[in-house]
């Protein structure tokens, strides 16, 4: 079940390379993110995401790949019309 719309889906080249090396797909992470499985986050970050579902602010997830590499998935805050423009998969150091 989807908790929110993700907008345009993008990923950095380094994130795609990390996914390929771990034999995982972007879709796996995006499905988890969209249904509210926030991955490897602190309780306070999880709570911030739950609040973001209500107030339209940024949504953030972190996942550890099979290779041990961490990836972030970030969905931008809603604009004035209530639309979330994009979701990006990236390495933490690319933020």
How should each PLM-predicted stretch be described?
Residues 1-60:
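Compact soluble domain cores
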Residues 59-95:
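Short, compact, well-ordered microdomains
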């Amino acid at each position: 079940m989807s908790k929110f719309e993700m907008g345009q889906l993008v990923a950095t080249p380094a994130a795609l390379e990390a996914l390929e090396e771990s034999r995982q797909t972007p879709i796996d992470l995006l499905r988890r993110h969209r249904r509210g499985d926030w991955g490897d986050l602190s309780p306070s970050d999880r709570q911030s995401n739950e609040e973001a579902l209500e107030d339209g602010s940024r949504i953030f997830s972190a996942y550890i790949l099979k290779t041990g590499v961490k990836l972030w998935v970030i969905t931008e805050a809603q604009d004035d019309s209530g639309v979330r423009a994009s979701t990006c998969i990236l390495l933490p150091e690319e933020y």
